[in-house]
Amino acid sequence: MAAAALLLLAAAAAAVVVAMALRWLLLLGGPAAGRLGKRARMPPGSTGLPLIGETLRLISAYKTPNPEPFIDERVARHGGVFTTHVFGERTVFSADPAFNRLLLAAEGRAVHSSYPSSIATLLGARSLLLTRGAAHKRLHSLTLTRLGRPASPPLLAHIDRLVLATMRQWEPAATVRLMDEAKKITFNLTVKQLVSIEPGPWTESLRREYVKLIDGFFSIPFPLAYFLPFTTYGQALKARKKVAGALREVIKKRMEEKAENGGSIGDDEGKKEKKDMVEELLQAEGGSFSEEEMVDFCLSLLVAGYETTSVLMTLAVKFLTETPAALAELKEEHANIRDMKGKNQPLEWSDYKSMPFTQCVINETLRVGNIISGVFRRANTDIHYKDYTIPKGCKIFASFRAVHLNNEHYENARTFNPWRWQINNKLQNAVGANIFTPFGGGPRLCPGYELARVVVSIFLHHLVTRFSWEETEEDRLVFFPTTRTLKGYPINLRLLSESIC
């Protein structure tokens, strides 16, 4: 899913000190070095400095608002597919949309996703992120069943209500860090979808531990960290046990309820209100999922639903604030919807489908922001592309960012321009042409991509129809270890109406 690449990039970066040292020692005399060296037609490029390769150059570039030169300079010298050496090993970078398409489609055959062991330890070996082949297909299908139907009236009602619940906590004139507030919304919504528990002391306690778990993805998991609880990674492991334990208690209770009903979930109204991912798992395949499988699966969905959607919400507001004409048009679109519905009526699917400019804003935020800058894959076999051979075992990075910000595909590509999605018919086929891949593609296409759009649309609707705002201080984007604003995007909010109902 979309968060998979986000976690991979962060964890790989965090582990760079250990990985580079170990990998370098292995490559000095090991068979991998000879195999790579004998391939005359590897994509051209540079391996940079001994031991560290070009890792520091990449990190330095991605810690700025403009990381493009790292890839642009190499594409200019070597072409759209080139070789570098980052995070401890030789890696082929692709800024070629056709090759990226092949990589995404070849998941599970010619390539597979590759993650550090620290990720597996924190998420669990049975998580959606880490499973492969038939096991991944099974979990992906279940996720799509639950998250791929955002038109469901109960789901829309939950989103609408949870967004407003967070906004009610904002005072008539408040200063908030929008990133933090967006994360509260996405966390509470994901918990609701997983286990049907409303925001309260239980969810807040879970969220506090969960934040520690997330911090572990961006830390250095050196060997002693597993045994030292005062390190960031050690604290993340401890938090993982608590989060998994809390989920396990809920799942165990639901399994007991099912057993008491003779293996049936039940059809009474109370049970219908509880319909969530846990019940999907309990009903699937005759209840064949084990308790641990369900815990790992739910934990991985909690991670996937948290970071990327909240960043998308924040960046949409930031880009709109910096583009007054776009903000004015968005406000007009949502004011018209609110006028037709009345002040306090919740949004419905027909309202969501009446937000064409909002979808343009979301597309453009995804394209310019590049919350997922790309995905790593590892070759299962020798891969032949054009005149090059990428050997089995080689790591490959498919850069979505390089394609999204290429002037050959988008006019003035580095300018936020949501109208480009209205007037340029060519872009209507952008997804099919694989020049627009914000949610990945192939078997690992994010199953919750449409739900993410719905959440952001509803959030923007209530924000622009209830508040005005201004930035309290300058905040800039950085892209390492993840896409985010440095300060969480602090803004001053002013309530437009007297109450939020």
From Swiss-Prot:
The chain crosses the membrane at residues 2-22. Pathway: Plant hormone biosynthesis; brassinosteroid biosynthesis. Pfam families: p450 (PF00067). It comes from the Eukaryota. Its EC number is 1.14.99.-. It is found in: Cell membrane. Heme binds at C446. Highly expressed in shoot apex and inflorenscence. Expressed in roots, stems, leaf blades and leaf sheaths. It is a single-pass membrane protein. It comes from Oryza sativa subsp. japonica (Rice). Belongs to the cytochrome P450 family. Its cofactor is heme. Keywords: Brassinosteroid biosynthesis, Cell membrane, Heme, Iron, Lipid biosynthesis, Lipid metabolism, Membrane, Metal-binding, Monooxygenase, Oxidoreductase, Steroid biosynthesis, Transmembrane, Transmembrane helix. One of its GO terms (molecular function) is heme binding. This is Cytochrome P450 90A4. One of its GO terms (cellular component) is plasma membrane.
